[in-house]
Amino acid sequence: MIAESTCSSIFVAHPKGHQGGRALLCYQALTRIALEHCTTARGAVELIGQLAVDHGFYGNVGAALSGSAETLAIVDTQEAWVLHLMPDDTGSSAVWCAQQVPT
């Protein structure tokens, strides 16, 4: 299961083809890919983080700083994780961190 909450960031990125954007992936795409390809929460965290860094992450299109990042709760039957994801200062990658939640 993956749940999300939109939050603030110090950087804003735009999708490719929109306002000169260079980022390819939003949280909806990242979560869909993770749900399709991962069998564990840990694997989903690692995949989302790597894809965001490699291909760029953008928050809500047209959002100011207040909607440019996401926090994801990622849970399986064994582990729970919280992942925070935001664009980097170039608009073409991402900065992320994750913490396992004690169960």
In which residue ranges do the predicted regions lie?
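N-terminal nucleophile
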Residues: 1-103
